[in-house]
Amino acid sequence: MTVAYFDCPAGVAGDMCLGALLDLGVPLDYLQSQLAKLGIANEFELTTETVQRRGQRGLKAQVHLRDRHGHHHRHWPEIADQICAAHLPDRARDWSLKVFEALAIAEGAVHGIEPEKVHFHEVGAVDALVDIVGTCLGLDYLDVRQVYCSALPTGGGTVKAAHGQLPVPVPAVLELCQRYRVPLYSNGIEKELVTPTGAALVCALSAGFGAPPAMTLQRVGLGAGTQELPLPNLLRLWLGTVPAPPETGTAKTIVELQTQLDDMPPQALSYACEQLYAAGALEVFCQPITMKKSRLGVLVTVLCPPSAEAACVQTLFRETTTLGLRRQVQERYILERQMREIPTPFGTVRVKVAEHQGQRLNVQPEYEDCAALARQHQQPWQVVYQEALAVALKLWPLG
């Protein structure tokens, strides 16, 4: 299985990602032909140049805009429609949507508005579309199955933006790093090292941050940045292989705790279930049973990860009348799942997207989000749910 590791000693930006992928062998004409499907072929030219950064070779990717003043601001739903209509390779399309989605949510949080209302000043521009979609196309071309990233340098100072001078890291980058729990450090360089586009790419696509995973290294692509820095301004993209995961699916270990109760009022049992979820239980369910002396009771079953077992045991003893518990460790198979956010006419809805061996099998809007929006807009729950499901299936069709 092919994996990629973004090694970012000098930070990360969209053009650096593109340069590193082109340096790894992604054909320039392939990217240009695929990007033309976005309907922007007449608006840009993508070129490369071999450059030196502190004595080290790197490949500089440059997006030359043919009209710097003719691009209107775009919203996230417009960008999603543009990408979906382009008939890109499935994984490249999905990754591109995921990156723009992450950026829309971050920008919305910074400005205090819904993601679908964000004006993409820089991100909606053609150069950023090329950087983001081009990077996703390159990773797909190299058949990368898993992406990892190093800790990111914070940079420092200020940078000029559409709203004036901003401190570095800029707010959108900080929001992304906070949401995705990215490890940060300072290398003492007082410049912008991580751009919003670069942060969105590594945050949305990476399975983890920190040290590189164990891999057999095949080659390294070097993407050059624009600024002159005290260290080589290069993104180092490692390409390697790891053993493929089992074909039978994703296995997870869980602990099952059970107890039978016949002397608890239902109100107390309801509260106990709430406390079990708060303690880290994955699932809690109660089944009616007949106990000794023909007394009616309930069988309480708790499923939890091993890390939450002690807390769930303590909660059962504290909140129920049980004098003992049964325990067994089980293996379960689960689909690969991702929680995504989508814009709808009623507001943002979280959607659970489930896959198995690269095939998308299930897409489900979250009940609570639909219920909250139904109450807010005084609409039937089904109306909100069906609207969210239609948007989700358009972005992530099954199969």
Swiss-Prot record:
Pfam assignment, any one: Ni_insertion
Alphabetically ordered keywords of this record: Nickel
Statement: the UniProt record of this protein carries the keyword Transcription regulation: no
Single GO term (MF): lyase activity
InterPro entries referenced in this protein's UniProt entry, alphabetically: Ni_insertion
Keyword Methyltransferase: no
Family, per entry: Belongs to the LarC family.
Protein name: Putative nickel insertion protein
